[in-house]
């Protein structure tokens, strides 16, 4: 098609593009029909119509159009091809983009089409195929960059298969690269050839050659800052064990960049490596040489410290790092037990650091890294020194606008807490400290930064009481304090993050939603911070909000993947090859995110139970439309933990790290297990519906049904063993929102669903044998009603005359949500069973049979009615169907019972929000009391909205 014809076509299609861009999909569909009415052979308009149908969620209609047009031998213009690509990407059929361009180059092997095929292969990580296309582009069009695309494809193949890469792929890539450089030289102003050569050398682990390569004049054009170039060169030398050369370069560089912490780490690690080499033998000369290495490091640190004064932190931290690394030596240096003469006394150095850098908020984090290296005596001496110093600072006159004293107090209290002093204090001491912190936070003209750090310190103290003693009153006081700070502090996000974590334990979804909006979390952070809110909407029964949140997360992952792939394509075009492996790794990281998979599975689960009505659509959603025949399965063992637990800082003792590590492992395992449980349940439910699908091979459908039900049963039994009923969620401040898997698997609800799934398996076998099912296959209505009432009756636990504890309402809300999910799941199973019976039973009357003859009198009519009644009674399948339909009545009754129970629960007179707050706090009590009414009102409204949402769901679904 000529440019003029293409311009005419684009002008004709412009209204459709505008409607699609403005998301007016019905108008876009109308515009497509208008164009096709006048120009029925316009392929671009047909494909745009398919794209519109995809966005209107009419995938079947869109697929019909696409399959008719995307056939071998078809010619398509550029606008049509672009529309095809959008269709396939929007419907997650990325491999069809590859097939599309493979067909196109058979009829039109233009440079543009071959380039698009190369990029399509790149998106699907088909590196062998893209290598061939790269070479074809180079041979056909003689453009050197295409040659380098082929070389880069070899490097990517080598990364996928390291063994083959070292033997064949990387040597081949090296030879190809050298041949091209010898033939054409380096491209002026471009780093493409250099990038490739360095990647090849790194892949072959030729560290000496890598270091020499960076010394070449041409290396200056590599896409990295000069100081990064120096650091990378030293990193290569370290790997090649050229420690003397590293020392020479690093010592020269550190005098120019004294605050570059990476240089200090390299110098120290190089020194340690040389010491370890010396200690391999007990030779006196080697031992003396080891002493000299330590002394040389000490002299360098001292020299740079004098050079920079207290303007830079890195030279002073280097002293602590040297102590730490030398202490880690597997074999200690003889005659050097005390290094005070070289580096100075460690505690004195740490006190000196605190006195000179305490105004920097990062000062505590710098010191905390090295507290674990101190002995008990050293810790005690450090605390004594800090107490003396804070006394001196406090004695100084106050200066208006100067917060030096506040930062000194903050550093002191954080150090005391991290070194275990808080654990030695009694309850009165803790309360007094809490009072002082509130006074400092509420002080007039307190800067937002200092206020936020003070609040974080205070929250750590109150969260401890909640974690260790389950003190819900102090937990509520913590929420009040956080709300007090969040109301006035617009810049510090830590308080809002801590509030989200606190409210997630209370299922206070309304306030969580508001806080997430005010935080303005960046899109990519939704992956790492999603754990703060992920299961809350589901556990609290707000299923529509859960679906919205999960949909937003899914869209974020799709958009991130698209942007990464676009960046990779751009990197190929610009010759920035060193960025491609990193971006490919990022893409893989996003694809294997456990959070992403958990969101997708929960969306399928909740949408099928509470949103969709059509049985066929429910079946497809439950099974997963990306897995039509069951070949693709989630590999749960490959999923990656992308959660960021450093979002909420902590000031704790060394033992807390072990608790944190244990929490990370346990909560990640729970996330995987609950997601797999939902997934196996979805697939088992979907497999029941797939038995009735026309396009399913009957034997495969039945095999899948048996296998998926067995998988669900086995995983449910596994979860019951792994998560005993007495297990409680982690109460660490950094832990994710609780999933309550233990409560769910021991509630009895999932076991009920399993019973009906197993009945469905037996039902299919019975029907296949030509027999009709008995009512007993699914149990009686009375049995169902008894189990449902037991599932729903979840009154708060208390002794006679005893008041309920604060926030008692949270547990019944969670149990009600899970009970509602059970009722909905059973409803879906029964609907699917009903469809199976209607599909598989031969000659089942679905309506009342017509009489054979027309009776004239009352006697004849009565006889006809009796005959029909007898015929229906004799048909077991009809009786079974009527029994299934009657069981739906029990489900509706259970829904109404749950509705009534929620109303009664809200009517209980027991207060679920603590009222005795701020005791023994003196004047600081006013700050908490001022927040009590608005916070209590928000919590009550949130709990009420949660119950109302469940009421609405019950009315709509049952």
From Swiss-Prot:
Keywords: Chromosome, Chromosome partition, Cytoplasm, DNA damage, DNA recombination, DNA repair, Meiosis, Nucleus, Repeat, TPR repeat
TPR repeats mapped onto the chain: 7-42, 78-111, 320-353
Keyword Disulfide bond tagged: no
Gene Ontology CC annotations of this record: chromosome; cytoplasm; NatB complex; nucleus
Main location per the UniProt record: cytoplasm
Protease keyword on record: no
Compartments reported by the entry: Cytoplasm; Nucleus; Chromosome
Disruption phenotype: High embryonic and larval lethality with viable progeny displaying a high incidence of males phenotype. Defective chromosomal morphogenesis, segregation and alignment due to the failure of central region components of the synaptonemal complex to assemble onto chromosomes during meiosis.
Subunit architecture: Component of the N-terminal acetyltransferase B (NatB) complex. Interacts with acer-1.
Protein name (Swiss-Prot/TrEMBL): N-terminal acetyltransferase B complex subunit NAA25 homolog
Gene name of the record: cra-1
């Amino acid at each position: 098609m000529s440019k003029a014809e293409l311009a005419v076509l684009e002008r004709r299609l412009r209204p459709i593009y505008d409607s699609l861009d403005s998301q007016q999909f019905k108008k876009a569909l109308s515009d497509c029909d208008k164009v096709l009415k006048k120009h029925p052979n316009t392929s671009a308009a047909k494909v745009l119509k398919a794209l519109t149908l995809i966005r209107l969620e009419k995938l079947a209609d869109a697929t019909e159009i696409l399959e008719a047009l995307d056939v071998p031998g078809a010619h398509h213009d550029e606008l049509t091809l672009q529309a095809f690509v959008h269709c396939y990407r929007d419907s997650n059929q990325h491999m069809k983009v590859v097939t599309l361009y493979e067909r196109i180059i058979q009829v039109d092997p233009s440079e543009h089409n071959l380039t698009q095929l190369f990029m399509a292969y790149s998106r699907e990580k088909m590196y062998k195929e893209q290598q061939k296309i790269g070479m074809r582009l180079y041979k056909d069009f003689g453009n050197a960059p295409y040659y380098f695309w082929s070389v880069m494809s070899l490097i990517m193949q080598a990364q996928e298969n390291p063994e083959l890469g070292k033997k064949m792929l990387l040597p081949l890539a090296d030879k190809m690269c050298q041949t091209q450089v010898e033939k054409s030289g380096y491209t002026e102003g471009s780093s493409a050839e250099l990038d490739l050569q360095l990647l090849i050398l790194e892949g072959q682990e030729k560290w000496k050659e890598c270091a020499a390569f960076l010394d070449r004049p041409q290396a200056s054009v590599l896409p990295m800052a000069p100081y990064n170039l120096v650091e990378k060169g030293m990193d290569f030398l370290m790997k090649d064990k050229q420690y003397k050369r590293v020392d020479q370069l690093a010592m020269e560089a550190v005098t120019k960049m004294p605050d570059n912490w990476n240089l200090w780490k390299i110098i120290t690690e190089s020194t340690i490596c040389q010491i370890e080499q010396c200690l391999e033998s007990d030779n006196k000369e080697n031992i003396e040489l080891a002493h000299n290495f330590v002394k040389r490091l000490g002299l360098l640190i001292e020299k740079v410290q004098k050079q920079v004064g207290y303007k830079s932190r890195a030279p002073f931290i280097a002293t602590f790092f040297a102590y730490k690394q030398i202490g880690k030596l597997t074999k200690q240096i003889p005659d050097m037990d005390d290094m005070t003469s070289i580096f100075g006394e460690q505690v004195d150095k740490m006190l000196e650091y605190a006195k000179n850098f305490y105004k920097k908020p990062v000062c505590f984090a710098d010191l905390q890294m090295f507290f674990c290296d101190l002995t008990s005596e050293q810790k005690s001496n450090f605390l004594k020194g800090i107490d003396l110093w804070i006394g001196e600072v406090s004695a100084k006159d106050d200066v208006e606008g100067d917060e030096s004293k506040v930062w000194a107090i903050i550093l002191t209290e954080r150090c005391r807490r991290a070194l275990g002093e808080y654990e030695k204090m009694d309850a009165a001491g803790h309360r007094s400290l809490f009072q002082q912190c509130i006074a400092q936070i509420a002080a007039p003209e307190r800067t937002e930064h200092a206020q936020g750090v003070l609040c974080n310190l205070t929250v750590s103290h109150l969260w401890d009481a909640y974690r260790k003693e389950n003190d819900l009153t102090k937990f509520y006081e913590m929420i009040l304090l956080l709300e007090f700070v969040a109301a006035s502090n617009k810049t510090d996000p830590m308080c809002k993050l801590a509030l989200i974590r606190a409210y997630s334990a209370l299922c206070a979804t309304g306030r969580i939603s508001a806080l997430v909006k005010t935080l303005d979390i960046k899109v990519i952070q939704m992956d790492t911070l999603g754990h703060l809110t992920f299961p809350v909407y589901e556990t609290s029964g707000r299923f529509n909000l859960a679906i919205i949140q999960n949909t937003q997360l899914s869209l974020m992952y799709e958009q991130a993947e698209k942007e990464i792939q676009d960046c990779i394509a751009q990197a190929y075009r610009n010759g920035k090859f060193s960025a491609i492996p990193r971006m490919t790794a990022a893409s893989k990281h996003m694809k294997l995110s456990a959070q992403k998979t958990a969101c997708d599975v929960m969306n399928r689960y909740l949408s099928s139970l509470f949103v969709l009505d059509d049985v066929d659509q429910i079946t497809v959603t439950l099974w997963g439309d990306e897995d039509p025949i069951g070949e693709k399965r989630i590999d749960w063992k490959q999923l990656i933990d992308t959660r960021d637990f450093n979002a909420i800082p902590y000031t704790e003792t060394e033992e807390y790290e072990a608790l944190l590590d244990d929490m990370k492992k346990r909560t990640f395992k729970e996330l995987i297990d609950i997601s797999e449980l939902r997934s196996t349940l979805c697939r088992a439910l979907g497999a029941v519906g797939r038995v009735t699908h026309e396009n399913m091979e009957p034997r495969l459908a039945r095999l899948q049904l048996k296998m998926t039900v067995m998988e669900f049963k086995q995983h449910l039994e596994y979860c019951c063993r792994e998560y005993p009923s007495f297990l409680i969620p982690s109460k660490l401040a950094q832990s994710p929102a609780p999933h309550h898997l233990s409560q769910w698997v021991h509630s009895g609800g999932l076991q009920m669903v399993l019973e009906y799934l197993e009945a469905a398996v037996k039902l299919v076998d019975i029907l296949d044998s030509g027999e009709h099912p008995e009512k007993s296959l699914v149990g009686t209505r009375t049995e169902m009603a008894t189990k449902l009432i037991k599932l729903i009756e979840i009154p708060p636990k208390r002794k006679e005359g005893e008041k309920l504890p604060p926030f008692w309402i949270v547990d019944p809300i969670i149990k009600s949500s899970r009970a509602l999910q059970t009722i909905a799941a059973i409803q879906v199973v029964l609907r699917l069973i009903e469809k199976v019976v209607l599909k598989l039973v031969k000659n089942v009357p679905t309506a009342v049979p017509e009489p054979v003859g027309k009776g004239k009198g009352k006697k004849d009519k009565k006889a006809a009615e009796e005959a029909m009644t007898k015929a229906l009674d004799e048909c077991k399948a009809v009786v079974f169907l009527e029994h299934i339909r009657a069981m739906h009545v029990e489900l509706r009754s259970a829904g109404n019972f749950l509705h009534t129970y929620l109303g009664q629960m809200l009517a209980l007179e027991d207060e679920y929000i603590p009222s005795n707050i701020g005791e023994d706090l003196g004047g600081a009590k006013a700050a908490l009391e001022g927040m009590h009414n608005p916070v209590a009102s928000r919590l009550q409204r949130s709990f009420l909205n949660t119950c109302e949402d469940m009421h609405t769901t019950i009315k709509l679904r049952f």
